[in-house]
Amino acid sequence: MSSVTIGKCYIQNRENGGRAFYNLGRKDLGIFTGKMYDDQIWSFQKSDTPGYYTIGRESKFLQYNGEQVIMSDIEQDTTLWSLEEVPEDKGFYRLLNKVHKAYLDYNGGDLVANKHQTESEKWILFKAY
């Protein structure tokens, strides 16, 4: 596996160039294709479970609960993500949820997850500072 950014990073989609964001004050989670804002900076950390990572922001964790992508107050198996390298797109990954085996994706401005590999599931993580 290529070098992965651990720590503060942006999570940017290959297909539309949008970056994942979460704003606690507005309780707003999604993807934004415009200017870079602080609410797009995530904490990407190795979990205690080998091969899995947590994606957090504002003391919450990105979670797929089997129906929707949301933010959780508690680190649990549904907040763990593995990385699958995309060989044809160097540096890009698919983020796979540990429990539901669904890939992080987007639909319009919303973060979603699905079980079928698509072009819109390719993400790059790059250092925020």
UniProtKB/Swiss-Prot annotation:
Chain positions recorded as a carbohydrate binding sites: F21, Y22, N23, R26, K27, D28, F32, Y37, D38, D39, Q40
Reported uses of this protein in biotechnology and industry: This protein has potential for the detection and control of certain cancer cells and cells of the immune system, that display asialo-GM1. Has potential clinical applications since it recognizes glycans expressed specifically by the target antigen for Guillain-Barre syndrome (GM1b), natural killer (NK) cells and basophils (asialo-GM1) and glioblastoma multiforme (SSEA-4) in vertebrates.
Outcome of mutating D39H: Loss of hemagglutination
Keywords: Hemagglutinin, Lectin
Activity modulation comment: Hemagglutination activity requires divalent cations such as Ca(2+). Hemagglutination activity is weakly inhibited by monosaccharides such as D-Gal (25 mM), D-GalNAc (25 mM) and D-Fuc (25 mM) and by disaccharides such as melibiose (25 mM) and lactose (25 mM). Hemagglutination activity is inhibited by bovine submaxillary mucin, but not by porcine stomach mucin or fetuin.
GO molecular function, one term: carbohydrate binding
Stored InterPro entries: Ricin_B-like_lectins
Superkingdom to which the source organism belongs: Eukaryota
Subunit text: Homodimer.
Function: Galbeta1-3GalNAcbeta1-4Galbeta1-4Glc oligosaccharide-binding lectin. Binds strongly to the oligosaccharides of ganglioside GM1b and to a lesser extent its precursor asialo-GM1. Binds weakly to asialo-GM2 oligosaccharide and to the glycan moiety of globo-series stage-specific embryonal antigen 4 (SSEA-4) hexaose. Binds galactose, N-acetylgalactose and lactose. Does not bind GM1. Does not bind to Gal-beta1,3-GalNAc (Thomsen-Friedenreich antigen), the oligosaccharide of GM1a ganglioside or SSEA-4 tetraose. Does not bind to N-glycans, O-glycans or glycosaminoglycans of glycoproteins.
Protein name: GM1b/asialo-GM1 oligosaccharide-binding R-type lectin
Organism name: Mytilisepta virgata
